[in-house]
């Protein structure tokens, strides 16, 4: 039996037919999880943008209804409509801020994926 070199003790030799060592496999798994997270963040941001679009459409219809009501002989109480519009605007602003955070997260994930040197 021959003595074990210091290099052999630290690093096991890979055989040509053996499966990948844990380091590259872990790197690929890490990259795959980053890709999945980026895709999830993209779809979350897309959903938020669709919600914002829906809110903006609701605001637009409220404003148009209010304008039609203002021209009609018997106008609706203006305070109620203004309150609804203000509430919808506040919700749209909140959703827009959340969508902006999602966008920043997507950019951050993309930069992490681009900077990953595992593959």
Swiss-Prot record:
InterPro entries: MRFAP1. It comes from the Eukaryota. It holds the Pfam family MRFAP1. Residues 1-16 have a biased composition (Basic and acidic residues). One of its GO terms (biological process) is regulation of cell cycle. Residues 1-36 are annotated as: Disordered. Belongs to the MORF4 family-associated protein family. May play a role in cell proliferation. May interact with CDK2AP1. This is MORF4 family associated protein 1 like 2. It comes from Homo sapiens (Human).
